[in-house]
Amino acid sequence: MVTNFNGILLFRRDYRERDMLIKFLTAEYGKKMFFIRGARRRGFKMAAELLPFTMGEYVGDLRDQGLSYINSVKSVQYLEHISQDIALNAYATYVMNLMDVAFPDNQPVGRWYQQLTSALQLIDQDVAPALVANVVEIQLLQPFGVAPELRWCTVCGRSDLPLDYSESYGGLLCQQHWHLDPHRLHASPAAIFYLRQFSVLDLAKVHSIKVKPRTAAELRRILDEIYQNSVGVRLKSKRFIDQMGSWYQPLAPRKNED
């Protein structure tokens, strides 16, 4: 079926001597793998439009099974700052990898196309990339099959008491029921607050995110435990982010920016 589609380029892979496989998350049809003949040849006409960290509108032959094909590019947005900054690159790669793992190929992803678009645009603007990644991680728990209860206590339904996260109970426990799980995460009220807020945050409406460093570090710890113990997903791009803190030095602020 030859049709217009909107897509986010998730990754590229060399194929044979002169060709390439490119996976897109499409707004209409979910994840699709495209065969790009001659993409590695010098002078390939769509080379600039099929760079990493691009999104746009395309015309292609989309197949229900097997590889699809791109005929032409109608418009494209290049996330330039992500491509130039190793930290932004790392967080963008991580959230795209999570999306790739969370959803099967060839199935529409609904609101997640816009949520990933917004996440990448915020990261490209250097708007709290680590926290944007946290939002994606928290909201992807449901597609991963974990779906913790973050609205109220899983035992009694109360939300007016201090809350903590329990992996055993699949979500929050209020203070009256903390004794039920001695291995609860012992999270601070601030970390639980942002865990709950981020679970419903629409990134399209976000212009800035500010969280104290101590709370951000605790949120990172909580999500690492949940992903390790409940989700079971450990990506190379996440390990790179974990290691990056020991050697990465941010670039100087870009000129003409606040």
UniProtKB/Swiss-Prot annotation:
Its domain of life reads: Bacteria
Fetch the SUPFAM superfamilies from UniProt: ArfGap/RecO-like zinc finger, Nucleic acid-binding proteins
DNA repair is among the record's keywords: yes
Q: Sorted alphabetically, which InterPro entries does this protein's record hold?
A: ARFGAP/RecO, DNA_rep/recomb_RecO_N, NA-bd_OB-fold, RecO, RecO_C
Q: Biological process GO terms, please? A: DNA recombination; double-strand break repair
> Could you tell me which cysteines form disulfide bridges?
none
For this UniProt entry, what's an example GO CC term? bacterial nucleoid
Q: Which UniProt keywords apply?
A: DNA damage, DNA recombination, DNA repair
Family (UniProt): Belongs to the RecO family.
Q: What is the stated purpose of this protein? A: Involved in DNA repair and RecF pathway recombination.
NCBIfam families tied to this protein: reco
User: What is this protein called in UniProt?
Assistant: DNA repair protein RecO
